[in-house]
Every structure is written in C-alpha cells, then in structure tokens.
Amino acid sequence: MTMSPELSQKLAAAVDRMPAFPRSVQQILQLTRDVNCSPKDLVRVIDHDPVVTVKILRVVNSAYYSLPKQITSVNHAVVYMGFNSLKNLALSIAAIGMLPKDNVAGFDAHEYLLHSLTTANIAKLLAGRIGIDPNDCFIAGLLHDFGKVVFAQFMPKEFREALAMAEWGQSSLHLALRAVIGTDHAVVGAMLVEKWRFAAELAETIRHQHGEDLIDTPMIACVFAANQISKKLKFGSGGNPCIDELPPAIAQRLGGTLDEVIASLGDLDAMFEEAKIFASS
C-alpha cells in the first residue's frame, strides 16, 4: 500500500532512532557467510564483546544444558553448543537488547520474544527440509516481527489500538495496523533491517510476509509457515492471534497443509524450552 509523505517521514525518523545492531553481531554474520570461517574466528569476535560473552556463558551453564562442569569461556561453549547454535544465540542476545524494557502499548516484550525465537527455530527446521540455508531462515524468523517494536516505542497509542482490534478478533494485526496507522509492521521491519544492513533477501522476506503482499519464495514459505505454527501451538505471542492456513504455493513447497506440517515436525516442546532459556538471557 502507498504511504503518505508525512507517514513515510515519520516512520523513517522512528527507524532512525532505533539503536544500531551491535557491531560484534554484524561481524559474526559476516564471518559465517565466509566458507573459510572457523569456530576460532567466531570465538575471537565474541570474546571482544563482554555483554554477549557473559550472556552466552549464562545460557550454556543453565539447567537446560545440564553440563557436567561449569563452562568459563566462549571457546569451551562452542564445543558444547556447536558453531551455528552459538551464532544464533549471539543474534538472539542482540535482538533482546533492542526490546523495550517496559510493557509499552500493552505489548508484552517477553511473549513477543518467545514467539520470535520459536518462529526462528521452526523456520530453520523447515529450511533444512527444502534445501535452503537454515541459518538465514533463523535470522528471518527472529526478525520477522521487529517492526512491531518500532510501533510500540514510537507510536504506542496507535499500536495499542491495533493490538486491541486483533485481540478481539476484529482483524488480523497487519490489517489493523494498516487501518489505524496507514502501514504495517512488515514495511517498517523491512526498513529497519535495511538500516542494519542485512541481506536484501531478508528485507524482502519481512516486507512480503502477509496477505496480498505475500510472494512465493522459499524463505518466505518457511517464515510464513513457522509464524503460523508458533501461533497455533501458542509458543509466545506477537500480538496477533489470527492463524492463517498455508496458501497453495507454500503448502506445495512444504508438502502439506498447516496441520500436516505441524504433525510432521513431531514434538517441539524441547525447542520451546530452549527458546525460554534464550529469552531469559
């Protein structure tokens, strides 16, 4: 949908006021796109960020992992967690740092985070099935709703009104946002990841994840389905209880209806428990 110049300027200013993605995490993303990157390179970058280091050690030493001895260095953490899990945890920690500390606009940041983390992990599982990069889909799932954070912080009154419309079943949240504000979180989320200089495919996935704007790409298929699965299984909440069936093109890519895809994934409770640990970091 077309935005007015006034709204476009207002949103650009709000996005500009959002904090930068941590430099260490940007470096981690660059490293992991390099086929020659080793775990040692990743550890070196994380070691230079004390905040991320402390939180990683807190997670790896949690009861969830039940390790026989305490882990005191990122170098040891990568042995137990694995290269990609450590990278994804660092990304999750960065995303947590962007969230508002208070429950502004009636937006529960903790529930939102649980929804985002489980969407990320389910998108990663689905990506492995259809032969695309699971870690790119993890990032897309993690950040797919980040435009809501911009609205919660900089347009709280309007966002609260749209959340209420979605909660009472009057409309899906993205349609409620369009009615109240004039655009939705997908557009603003794409603006935000462009500011953070993520890959163009990620911005495209976030921008075109809903309704008539939905386009048929493998990454969008994974993120769209993961989003619906997280909502149906009540893994956290992004403020939008409306659950959509998989469009035919996505169902064809993933090999079934929403319920059939859920059944094929098996028990996801352990994954949700891990998301809770990540969210508490």
Predicted regions and their residues:
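Conserved alpha-helical "signature site"
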Residues: 1-248, 280
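Terminal targeting/low-complexity segments that flank the catalytic cores of oxidoreductases
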Residues: 1, 257, 263-281
